[in-house]
């Protein structure tokens, strides 16, 4: 056994790190943990990754470096033993509307190559395989017949451009040919009277009989080559006396159509050679949107589901369609969503009887809008057309993005577009069962290996419910990160350090085991895997744990624990006691040894009012009815892809907003919203998007604390003397702000050929305000000093009554402290008041919003929806978050939380578990009830894992 190697970091000082020394074992699986804001990311990304990136850039040529700029050294004394560093963060991979799961994982590139190499083209008319024929095919055809069977080798008449039929026949005579076949009759060329079309004439190349003699076979091959030459690539065998004929062509054609031979670009929707010419590879066009024409699919045709056919005048179209549809037994009373595809086609494109009618006498939705377009010169028709226009599936490629020729190429009976529309689970199973010839398997060996391995990686990280056609910009941050992880695994790099930011985000406990397996695979390739993580399973699975703390901001930044998993995984009470005495400041060790824990509530709140969603059918939801109780803490659970977001974000939230007459996106398909809907006066979706509408937004402005801070500074003697009103202390309006950077503290230089450059403003040195504004002090601090305080520091500072010397100071300070206290309550005491919203993590943004609502007074009954609020939270932070949740409920509000964290789930009053699996195996209501009832449900995967948390 060789000596263990380490990545050694000496004197790390980035952000709040307190000059710490850390040793990370090389080639191991290492977890870095700690409460939010303790300095984990500062160590992992701002120190470890930043130095790895800097060294990489420094290793490039001076020519390449001039485009990348000089990267500053991270704040530390030195780092030894650092391999090349790769960071995989929670960022959506691409905003490119063409980027998909398939392209970002490179699986689609391998599929394109596979279809180009072994794909077979089939004619859409006859379904026969299209192929180029050779003389070998001609020979093989003759071998089907018994020896001695006579046949004639023919070439279709090919007239060279500029020649007449007579001249061409004369040329054949000169070349030694004597006979032609005209309409089934053999005649001599010099006897031809010229009373036939050229396409009915064949040149007789040779007469022969079926034989296995070497000389006869050689003669047949020569004759076939001559026939292909004279017939411009075409040849015909006519067997006698049966008159059975077989056509051959060296051209890639069948059924009179010349097909395009498969190439990899033929399947590329990013290339003009493969993209659908109508939608240019996007899969959608601006057209008549089905969702706008039929917004409520639970209505029937008779009830008026077709919005544009309502009213006295337009209702004539509906009456006429119903009259004509009667012979076809069209179900006019059936809800639209229950109609078959055939019935929907009749409604949209016309009844079978309409095909015989004049186009202007047809009745369908398509014909209706054709009429509207013809009357666009009238204002009312232009308005109607714009009302129903939207992004809709391309009518030519039906959303496949590729030109129609690409779908003629198949492997195992499936086209590439059929494969990318399968879920990854089904696609992986399809490849396992795929039957290929020995030659095809040999040609596609490497490609098949890459495809199946990468599909397995996606399954291992819990993404089996996605399709390869899913747009990258529609993925969550956690899904994007796991896709990045599978791409890294696929590249098979070794000797690197991978740094991941909470890879378990969005994962059900069932999938965490698979993720650990993937991380282990990455490590066993010869890499060091460093994860910034709070998930207990991942911490216990790691080889080594580093805990930064003990608390957030200036109270953190120290190394409170570093050691192998064997230390904290021990169940020996003496060993646990010794560990706690040795590392008393580590909250992580206290939770892992169960000294501290999040208690299960003694009882659950009863409820008697609820909102009921009936017939939820969005995405994979199976027409389920769900009751969401009010005035209690409800958690929505289920594996990834089970339908949680579709139900809550896709249906409940927009439907409630519309009920409250607020602007909202169109909700997903559902039948009705019932129950105590009127008991809700507001609905708030607290997501992880940046706070505020402006990039200048920060925690102080978002929580309205900055108004009181500006008033306080304007109340100081110097400010009054200089005539500075509160407006002068705003960085959003002219007056006191630095006009060079418009109060941002930095300037952005647009670089035409590379990413924009952000530099500290030279005029104000990053302080945002003019010099005379910065001369105004309160308690020895100017406005810039206050903006650079953490929330904890600010609360302490503004609570100090010794500094409140002037009339109005006390009231302003009281307001500031009351506005900032909720931030402390949700565990964000470490963030700075003036911290730019773009630098806050998703979890931090969500908790700033939560703090805002906790701080609001006189709020009418509100339904709060949270999407994975524990993202980025340590056990210690989750405890605080749950207290904040209880505070909202005690004020009479209702809480609905989409969550995977079992510590949160066990504290719920009511659980709605969807599943049982993801994708097409999900979308059902598995169980709804208390945590104990969910644990008792044998089909609930959530219950299976929750069992260990409820004692």
Predicted feature residues:
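Conserved phosphate-binding elements of NTP-dependent enzyme cores
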Residues: 1-951
């Amino acid at each position: 056994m060789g000596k263990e190697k380490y990545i050694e970091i000496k004197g790390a000082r980035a952000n709040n790190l307190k000059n710490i020394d850390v040793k990370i074992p090389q080639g191991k699986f290492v977890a870095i943990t700690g409460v939010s804001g303790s300095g984990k990311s500062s160590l992992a990304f701002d120190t470890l990754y930043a130095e790895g990136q800097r060294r990489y850039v420094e290793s490039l040529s001076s020519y390449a470096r001039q485009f990348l700029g000089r990267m500053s050294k991270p704040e530390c004394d030195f780092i030894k033993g650092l391999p090349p560093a790769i960071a995989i963060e929670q960022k959506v991979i691409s905003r490119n509307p063409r980027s998909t799961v398939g392209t970002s994982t490179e699986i689609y590139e391998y599929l394109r190559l596979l279809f180009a190499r072994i794909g077979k083209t089939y004619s859409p008319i006859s379904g026969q395989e299209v192929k180029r024929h050779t003389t070998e095919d001609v020979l093989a055809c003759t071998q089907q017949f018994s020896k001695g069977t006579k046949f004639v080798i023919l070439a279709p008449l090919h007239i060279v451009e500029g020649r007449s039929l007579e001249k061409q026949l004369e040329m054949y005579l000169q070349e030694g040919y004597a006979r032609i076949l005209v309409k089934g009759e053999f005649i001599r060329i010099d006897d031809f009277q010229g009373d036939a079309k050229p396409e009915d004439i064949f040149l007789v190349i040779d007469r022969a009989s079926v034989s296995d003699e070497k000389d006869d076979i050689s003669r047949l091959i020569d004759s076939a080559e001559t026939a292909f030459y004279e017939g411009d690539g075409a040849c015909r065998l006519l067997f006698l006396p049966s008159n059975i004929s077989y056509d051959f062509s060296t051209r890639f054609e069948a059924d009179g159509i010349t097909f395009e031979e498969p190439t990899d670009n033929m399947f590329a929707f990013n290339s003009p050679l493969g993209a659908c010419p109508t939608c240019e590879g996007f899969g959608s066009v601006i057209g008549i949107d089905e969702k706008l024409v039929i917004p409520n699919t639970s209505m029937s045709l008779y009830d008026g589901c077709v919005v544009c056919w309502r009213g006295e005048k337009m209702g004539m179209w509906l009456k006429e369609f119903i009259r004509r549809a009667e012979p076809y037994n069209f179900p006019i009373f059936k809800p639209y969503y229950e109609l078959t595809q055939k019935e929907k086609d009749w409604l949209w494109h016309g009844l079978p009887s309409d095909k015989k009618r004049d186009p202007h006498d047809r009745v369908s939705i398509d014909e209706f809008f054709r009429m509207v377009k013809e009357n666009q010169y009238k204002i009312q028709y232009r308005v109607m057309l714009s009302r129903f226009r939207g992004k809709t599936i391309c009518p030519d490629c039906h959303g496949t993005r590729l030109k129609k020729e690409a779908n003629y190429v198949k492997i195992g009976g499936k086209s590439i577009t059929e494969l990318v529309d399968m879920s990854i689970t089904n696609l992986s199973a399809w490849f396992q069962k795929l039957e290929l010839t020995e030659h095809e398997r040999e040609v596609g060996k490497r490609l098949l290996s890459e495809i199946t391995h990468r599909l397995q990686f996606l399954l291992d990280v819990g993404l089996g419910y996605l399709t390869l056609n899913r747009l990258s910009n529609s993925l969550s941050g956690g899904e994007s990160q796991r896709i990045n992880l599978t791409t890294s695994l696929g590249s098979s790099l070794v000797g690197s350090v991978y740094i991941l930011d909470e890879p378990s985000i969005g994962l059900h406990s069932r999938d965490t085991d698979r993720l650990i397996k993937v991380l282990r695979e990455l490590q066993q390739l010869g890499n060091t895997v460093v994860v910034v993580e709070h998930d207990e399973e991942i911490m216990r699975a790691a080889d080594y744990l580093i805990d930064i703390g003990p608390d957030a901001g200036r109270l953190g930044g120290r190394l409170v624990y570093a050691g192998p998993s064997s230390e904290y995984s021990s169940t020996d009470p003496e060993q646990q006691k010794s560990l706690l005495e040795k590392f008393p400041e580590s909250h992580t060790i206290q939770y892992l040894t169960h000294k501290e824990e999040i208690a299960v509530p003694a009882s659950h709140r009863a409820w008697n009012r609820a909102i009921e969603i009936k017939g939820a059918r969005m995405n994979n939801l199976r027409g389920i009815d769900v009751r969401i109780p009010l005035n209690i803490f409800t958690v929505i659970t289920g594996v990834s892809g089970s339908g949680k977001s579709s139900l809550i974000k896709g249906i409940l939230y927009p439907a409630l907003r519309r009920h409250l007459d607020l602007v909202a996106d169109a909700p997903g398909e559902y039948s009705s919203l019932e129950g105590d809907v009127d008991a809700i006066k507001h609905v708030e979706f607290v997501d992880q998007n940046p706070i505020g509408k402006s990039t200048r937004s920060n925690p102080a402005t978002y929580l309205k604390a900055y108004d009181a801070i500006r008033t306080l500074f304007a109340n100081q003697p110097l400010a009054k003397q200089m005539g500075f009103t509160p407006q002068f202390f705003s960085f959003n309006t002219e007056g006191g702000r630095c006009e060079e950077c418009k109060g941002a503290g930095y300037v952005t230089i647009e670089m035409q050929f590379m990413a924009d450059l952000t530099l500290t403003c030279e005029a104000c040195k990053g302080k945002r305000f003019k010099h005379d504004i910065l001369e105004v002090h309160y308690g020895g601090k100017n406005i810039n000093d206050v903006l650079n305080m953490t929330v904890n520091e600010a609360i302490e500072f503004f609570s100090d009554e010794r500094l409140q010397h002037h009339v109005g100071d006390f009231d302003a300070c009281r307001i500031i402290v009351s506005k900032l206290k909720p931030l402390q309550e949700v565990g964000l005491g470490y963030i700075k008041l003036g911290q730019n919203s773009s630098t806050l993590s998703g979890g931090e943004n969500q908790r700033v919003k939560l703090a805002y609502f906790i701080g609001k007074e006189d709020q009418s009954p509100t339904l709060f929806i949270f999407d994975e609020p524990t993202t980025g939270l340590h056990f210690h932070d989750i405890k605080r978050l749950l207290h904040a949740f209880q505070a909202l409920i005690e004020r009479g509000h209702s809480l609905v939380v989409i969550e995977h964290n079992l510590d949160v789930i066990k504290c719920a009053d009511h659980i709605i578990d969807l599943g049982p699996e993801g994708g097409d195996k999900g979308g059902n209501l598995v169980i709804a009830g208390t945590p104990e009832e969910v644990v008792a449900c044998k089909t609930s995967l959530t219950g299976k894992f929750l069992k260990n948390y409820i004692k």
